Regions:
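Metal-cofactor-binding active-site regions of metalloenzymes
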Residues: 1-180
């Protein structure tokens, strides 16, 4: 314990500002339990996917100017999905995440839970594999050794839970993507 305290003290006082972050990155982190996969993806990544799909003509995405939510109904009151460096880009990142959040009229709780609906147009799409790969790569770079991702959308999970609660049964056939 004494050696660990001395090592930490030396890192904190090291004149090299990268010493402590490098050490902390190398430390094994344990696990991330009950991680909702859609909420573990950065807003910037969702916007990158939306821009790419729009450019490819797969799905046309836009940003609702008043709610800052991602939309596929792109008529009036919308803007193209912004790119990094655009003023709207930073606004959308703050709306879709806790970045720079300051409590005020909206609580942290309310802001956090409101974010999911803002990027829902793409998070429930065909990007589950991309989401899982993104989270696994980030975990590896942070030396995190265990992930427990939740792969169901809230509606799927709550409908299955409701069925069981009301006396129904749950089988592996009812669980998309479940491998016995």
């Amino acid at each position: 314990e004494q050696r660990a305290a001395e090592r930490m003290e030396a890192l904190v006082n090291d004149p090299d500002p990268t010493a402590l972050p490098q050490f902390l990155t190398a430390v094994p982190k344990g696990g991330d339990l009950h991680m909702h996969l859609s909420g573990a993806i950065y807003a910037e990544t969702y916007m990158e996917w939306a821009r790419a799909e729009t450019l490819a003509g797969t799905t046309k995405y836009c940003i609702n100017n008043s709610s800052l939510a991602l939309a596929t109904s792109c008529s009036s009151g919308v803007s193209p999905v912004p790119s990094p460096g655009d003023a709207l880009f930073d606004q959308v990142v703050r709306a879709w995440s806790m970045k720079d959040f300051v409590p005020g009229a909206e609580t942290g709780h309310d802001h956090f839970f409101a974010t999911f609906g803002k990027y829902g147009a793409i998070s429930g799409s065909a990007h589950h594999d991309d989401c899982l790969a993104d989270v696994m790569e980030r975990a590896e770079s942070e030396n995190q050794i265990y992930l427990e991702p939740m792969l169901f959308s809230n509606s799927t999970a709550s409908s299955k839970g409701s069925d069981v609660w009301q006396g129904g049964t749950l089988t592996t056939a009812a669980l998309p993507g479940f491998h016995a």
